[in-house]
């Protein structure tokens, strides 16, 4: 479904309209036209734009036109440089995947849920007609298993309301445990044939997150070489097996919306991991979005940059730490 629309390999624009300080300086300058051109020149076919609800919606549910004007500019630049666009709602009123955010209550609060529906109806009115170029990602990384029942209900209602406005737009839908692949099986059957199951992959965690200080599952001082990890084609085949079978059962496809490796891993070992996981993605026709983007305070690298990607990106691994550590040439010409 996504491949037929030219959406196969993408890159994340995190830290711009989400996970940020919302300052005008950040919103005006974090990503510029040349950055979008560079992404296209690297050979990517789409970008993922995470947005937080407060970019486009006031607390009373009313529209913030400045936020939509900014999204309009991204749409225009993507069209100019031949890129497709995934609009990802990274945070909604009452919920964020980031436990450090002061958002809670979404799954039990009808007012928050109505704001979620209204927000997506507005996005659908503005962008839902451009079905060849724009995809909607309903919500980033539902966390707790306890939420899945209500999330199935909420997402189905929301998709139904979107469909009254934008009947043909593709919608990405993820499950709990932060869009884990093995929880796709607990999603309801797709609302219709234009819903794609979405998952994220940072596995095996002890390899991709080695040195991380934000998860109790990792001892920060421990290091692991690629050869000492579980990583293999067979490992990912098993990890993705229930997601693949669930998608096949319901006649839909899969999208991996985030994946990568932390910066302490060598470029060589990172490249090995990317090559293995991308081989499995390609085998099963899974489109994907690599979580590479720019550093918080500096510009995108040029094609001749000799620094590693870890020096020029922002993370989407929970804490804004960089994570894909190959050289630019390796990442953009070899891992895909």
UniProtKB/Swiss-Prot annotation:
Pfam families: Cellulase. Keywords: Carbohydrate metabolism, Cellulose degradation, Glycosidase, Hydrolase, Polysaccharide degradation, Secreted. One of its GO terms (molecular function) is beta-glucosidase activity. The keyword Ribosomal protein does not apply. The keyword Secreted applies. GO terms for biological process: cellulose catabolic process. It is found in: Secreted. The active site is at residue 141. InterPro entries: Glyco_hydro_5 (IPR001547), Glyco_hydro_5_CS (IPR018087), Glycoside_hydrolase_SF (IPR017853), Glycosyl_hydrolase_5 (IPR050386). Its main location: secreted. Its EC number is 3.2.1.-. GO terms for cellular component: cell surface; extracellular region. Belongs to the glycosyl hydrolase 5 (cellulase A) family. Crystalline cellulose degradation. This is Cellodextrinase A. It comes from Ruminococcus flavefaciens. The lineage of its organism: Bacteria, Bacillati, Bacillota, Clostridia, Eubacteriales.
């Amino acid at each position: 479904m996504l491949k037929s629309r030219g959406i196969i390999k993408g890159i994340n624009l995190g830290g711009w309209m989400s996970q940020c300080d919302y300052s005008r300086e950040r919103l005006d300058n974090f990503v510029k036209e040349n950055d979008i051109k560079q992404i296209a020149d690297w050979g990517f076919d789409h970008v993922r734009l995470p947005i937080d609800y407060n970019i486009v919606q006031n607390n009373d549910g009313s529209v913030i036109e400045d936020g939509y004007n900014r999204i309009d500019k991204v749409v225009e630049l993507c069209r100019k440089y031949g890129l497709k666009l995934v609009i990802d709602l990274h945070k909604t009123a009452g919920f964020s995947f980031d436990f450090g955010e002061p958002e809670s209550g979404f799954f039990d609060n009808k007012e928050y849920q109505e704001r979620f529906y209204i927000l997506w109806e507005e996005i659908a009115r503005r962008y839902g007609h451009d079905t060849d170029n724009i995809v909607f990602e309903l919500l980033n990384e539902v966390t707790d298993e306890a939420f899945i029942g209500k999330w199935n209900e909420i997402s189905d209602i929301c998709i139904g309301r979107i469909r009254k406005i934008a009947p043909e737009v593709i919608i990405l839908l993820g499950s709990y445990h932060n869009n884990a692949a093995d929880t796709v099986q607990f999603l309801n059957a797709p609302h219709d044939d234009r819903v794609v199951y979405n998952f994220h992959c940072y596995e095996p965690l002890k390899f991709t997150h080695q040195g991380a200080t934000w998860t109790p599952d990792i001892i920060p001082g421990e290091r692991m070489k690629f050869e000492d990890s579980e990583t293999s084609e067979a490992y990912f085949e098993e990890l993705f097996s229930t997601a693949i079978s669930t998608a096949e059962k319901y006649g839909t496809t899969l999208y991996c919306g985030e994946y990568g490796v932390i910066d302490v891993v060598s470029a060589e070992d990172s490249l090995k991991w990317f090559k293995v996981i991308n081989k499995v993605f390609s085998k099963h026709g899974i489109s994907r979005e690599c979580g590479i983007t720019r550093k918080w305070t500096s510009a995108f690298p040029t094609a001749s940059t000799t620094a590693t990607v870890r020096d020029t990106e922002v993370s989407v691994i929970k804490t804004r730490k960089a994570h894909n550590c190959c050289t630019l040439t390796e990442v953009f010409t070899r891992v895909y």
